[in-house]
Regions:
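Active-site and adjacent substrate-binding regions of carbohydrate-active enzymes
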Residues: 1-323
Length: 323
C-alpha cells in the first residue's frame, strides 16, 4: 500500500489538517470519527460506517465505471435485481467541508452534527440514472434503494422511470400499533407517489427490531396475523424479512456473543442489531436446520417449537395464514 498505488484514489484519502488533526469533523455512524489514520501512508481514509468498510471514491471515474460493470456482471448471471445499501451516502461533497453542529443535547456524537456534506449529494441522481439504464436493458429487473438519514420526501426523489424502482421509507415501519398511525403513514407515502408510481412497504429488516417484539408478545401471533393482513393488502409492494412469516422473535445476547460493531461500542445503552439477525428456524434439528455447524449467531431458544416444519403442519399457524 502506497500513495502511488493505482487504487489509492479508489478510496477517500486526505492528509492531516494543520497540527495533525483529522481532515474534518465528520463522524462514523458506528461511533467515533469517520476518519482512520494510516501510519504507513501518513494519511486518513474515510469510513462513514466501520473502519473495516472504507468508503469508495465515487468521484473517481474508474470507480464509477467499475461499479456499473459490476451491475452488468450480475445481470448477465441472471439476478432479478439489486438492493442498494445506503446508496445516498455513496457521494460526498467534493471539498469535504465540516458539517454544521447541531444544537441541544444528543447522546451520540454522530447526532451532534448536521449531516449535509456526506449524504444526499446531487451527483447521486445521475448515478442512479446510469444504473437504471443498465437494468432497463434486461427484461423484468428491479432495483430498490435503502436511504440513509433521509425522510420520506427525500427518499421519493430517488424513485422514477429513470431512477430507482423503489426506495425504502421507515415511516410505516416506525408507526405505533394503531390503525390511525399506520393509516397516516400509508396515506402520506402513497400521496408522494401518486397514481402513476408504486409505493413499497416493510415492517422488518436487519436494522430494525422484529415486529413480533415491537407489536406483539412472546407468543401472541394474533396481532402478527392482523399486521400481515394490512401489509399484504395495502397498495404497494410488500417486503418480508426472513422469519417474519413464522413470527420469529429477537434473541437476547450477552456482550461476549455480540458481533455487531455498534453493539460492541455502545453496550449496554444499545445492545446491537444481532438480536434480530439470528438464523432462520427451519425445523427442530440442531441449529434449527440452518446449518450443520455452529452459526455466526446463536439460534433462538424457541426454535424447537417455532419453526417452518411445525407451522407448515398446523392449519391455523402464522405461516399458513401468510400462504
Amino acid at each position: 500500500m502506497s500513495r502511488n498505488n493505482p487504487y489509492h484514489d479508489w478510496y477517500i484519502w486526505r492528509d492531516p489538517a494543520p497540527g495533525g488533526s483529522m481532515p474534518n469533523n465528520w463522524r462514523s455512524w458506528f461511533g467515533g470519527p469517520a476518519w482512520e489514520f494510516d501510519e504507513k501512508l501518513g494519511q486518513y481514509y474515510l469510513h462513514i460506517f466501520d473502519k473495516s468498510q472504507p468508503d469508495l471514491n465515487w468521484r473517481n471515474p474508474d470507480v464509477r465505471a467499475t461499479m456499473l460493470d459490476i451491475f452488468r456482471y450480475w445481470l448477465n448471471k441472471g439476478v432479478d435485481g439489486f438492493r442498494l445499501d445506503v446508496f445516498n451516502a455513496w457521494y460526498k461533497e467534493a471539498d469535504l467541508r465540516d458539517n454544521p453542529k447541531q444544537t441541544g443535547f444528543h447522546l451520540r456524537n454522530f447526532e451532534k452534527i448536521d449531516h449535509i456534506y456526506e449524504i444526499s449529494q446531487p451527483e447521486m441522481i445521475p448515478a442512479l440514472q446510469d444504473i437504471r439504464k443498465i437494468l432497463d436493458a434486461y427484461p423484468d429487473r428491479y432495483v430498490v434503494g435503502e436511504t440513509f438519514l433521509a425522510d420520506a420526501a427525500q427518499a421519493r426523489t430517488y424513485v422514477g422511470d429513470d431512477r430507482l424502482h423503489a426506495a425504502f421509507n421507515y415511516g410505516y415501519a416506525n408507526s405505533p400499533f394503531s390503525a390511525k398511525a399506520f393509516g397516516k403513514a400509508i396515506q402520506y407515502w402513497d400521496s408522494l407517489h401518486g397514481e402513476k408510481a408504486w409505493p413499497n412497504y416493510f415492517l422488518n429488516n436487519h436494522d430494525t427490531s422484529r415486529s413480533s417484539i415491537r407489536y406483539a408478545g412472546p407468543d401472541d401471533d394474533a396481532k402478527l396475523k392482523l399486521l400481515a393482513t394490512m401489509h399484504l393488502t395495502v397498495r404497494g409492494t410488500p417486503y418480508l424479512y426472513y422469519g417474519e412469516e413464522i413470527g420469529m422473535r429477537n434473541i437476547s445476547l450477552p456482550y461476549s456473543q455480540i458481533q455487531d460493531p455498534p453493539g460492541k461500542r455502545y453496550w449496554p445503552l444499545f445492545k446491537s442489531r444481532d438480536g434480530f439477525r439470528s438464523p432462520m428456524q427451519w425445523n427442530a434439528h440442531p441449529f434449527a436446520g440452518f446449518s450443520s455447524v455452529e452459526p455466526w449467531l446463536p439460534v433462538h431458544p424457541n426454535y424447537k417449537v417455532r419453526n417452518v416444519t411445525n407451522q407448515a403442519g398446523t392449519p391455523a399457524s402464522l405461516l399458513n395464514f401468510y400462504k
